[in-house]
Amino acid sequence: MQFNIPTLLTLFRVILIPFFVVVFYLPFAWAPMVSALIFCIAAITDWFDGFLARRWNQSTRFGAFLDPVADKVLVAIAMVLVTEHYHSWWVTLPAATMIAREIIISALREWMAELGKRSSVAVSWIGKVKTTAQMVALAWLLWRPNIWVEYAGIALFFVAAVLTLWSMLQYLSAARGDLLDQ
């Protein structure tokens, strides 16, 4: 197994997750800001690892496996934390929608890979926009310095949920022929 800079960035993202969770629960006024900062650093590595792997031609099978896993674990844990913090349907509903979509699309990608058609459900531009909206919304909801940032975070969280459903429909449509094939 090769450890290059992109793969190390992905591993760093995974290592940041428990620190992000612990800081989230600390009983200090600075904890939300630092928790959001750790989350943002982890989120930025999600962009950099893929960019550097492509730019430096350092893509590896391990990195291709670990990157989406690290991304989904980071985002799912952040969604669980903000859902717990806010105790409200307007955070829980979009979070549940996005987590369910990730499970559905992960299963679809695995199944399409077994058919040798993984490229038909490759990441699309709408998926990238969705991920950006999720990350920004979650950072704002974790940070929560004032009510306006919280409202903006909740609004963007709903936008991310809509983009999530849109991208899921695109992926299901791309796989429709194989899904409905008898």
Swiss-Prot record:
Catalytic activity field: a CDP-1,2-diacyl-sn-glycerol + sn-glycerol 3-phosphate = a 1,2-diacyl-sn-glycero-3-phospho-(1'-sn-glycero-3'-phosphate) + CMP + H(+)
GO cellular component terms attached to this protein's record: plasma membrane
Cytoplasmic-side segments: 2-12, 82-86, 169-181
Periplasmic face residues: 38-60, 108-145
E.C. numbers: 2.7.8.5
Broad enzyme group: transferase
Main location: membrane
Taxonomic superkingdom: Bacteria
Keyword match Amino-acid biosynthesis: no
Protein name in the entry: CDP-diacylglycerol--glycerol-3-phosphate 3-phosphatidyltransferase
Listed GO MF terms: CDP-diacylglycerol-glycerol-3-phosphate 3-phosphatidyltransferase activity
The organism of origin for this protein: Salmonella typhimurium (strain LT2 / SGSC1412 / ATCC 700720)
Gene Ontology biological-process annotations: glycerophospholipid biosynthetic process; phosphatidylglycerol biosynthetic process
InterPro entries: CDP-alcohol_PTase-I (IPR050324), CDP-OH_P_trans (IPR000462), CDP-OH_PTrfase_TM_dom (IPR043130), CDP_ALCOHOL_P_TRANSF_CS (IPR048254), PGP_synthase_bac (IPR023762), Phosphatidylglycerol_P_synth (IPR004570)
Key words of the record: Cell inner membrane, Cell membrane, Lipid biosynthesis, Lipid metabolism, Membrane, Phospholipid biosynthesis, Phospholipid metabolism, Transferase, Transmembrane, Transmembrane helix
Keyword Transferase applies: yes
